[in-house]
Amino acid sequence: VRFLMGHPELEVEGIFTHFAKSDEEDKTSAYHQLELFQNFIDRIQTELGLTIPVKHCSNSAAILEMPQANMDMVRAGITTYGLYPSEEVSKDIVPLRAAMSLYSHIVYCKTIHAGQSVSYGGLFTAQKDTRVATIPVGYGDGYPRSLSGKGYVLIRGKKAPILGRVCMDQFMVDISEIPGVMEGDKVTLLGVDGTERITAEELGELSGRFNYEFV
C-alpha cells in the first residue's frame, strides 16, 4: 500500500477478499477472515490516511447469512442462477428458485432387441426389446461423461434413463415406458417438465460433481 501511495499515477479504486469457508454452517472461520480484512482496512485509513472507495468480500453464502460483510458491494455468483452455494447454507432466509433450464431434442428413435448393446464399450446390453432415443448432446458440450448409465432426462414429463456411455456429441436414453415419443420431441436435461424436475444439485450428485459445474 505504501508503494502504491508513492506512485501518484496509480489510483486505488477498491479492495476485496474472498471467503474460504462462508458456505459452511459453522461461520467461525469466515467471521475471523472478515475481522482480519476489516482490521487491515482500518489500519490503512488510520496509519496511512488512505480511504479506499469500494470494499467488498461477500460471496453468495455471505450475502445470504452474513449481512454485516456486505460492505459497499457484493458478488452474487451461484445465487444469480437461483441456486444455493452448499447444503449447509440456510434456505429459509432467502428462498431461491432455479433460473436456468437446458433443453435439447430427439434426433433419432429405434428399437433394439434383447442381446444388443448401446454406445461405446457395450456397457449397456438390452435384456428385452427396448426403445432408444438419441440426444445430440455430449461431453464435448459439457454434459458429463460420468452420467453414463446413471443420469436421466425428461421427455413428455417422464424420466428417460441414459443407456450406456455418454459420447462426445450424443447419448442414448430408454424411451420404452414413454408412449408416443418421436424424433423432434423436446428433451429436458436440466429443469422442469410436467411434474418432474432435474436439478443441478441432483446432476452433481449423480455425476460426482457439484452444482457450480452445471451452470
Predicted regions and their residues:
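C-terminal accessory subdomain/extension
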Residues: 111-215
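Active-site loop/helix belt of alpha/beta enzymes
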Residues: 1-105, 109-113
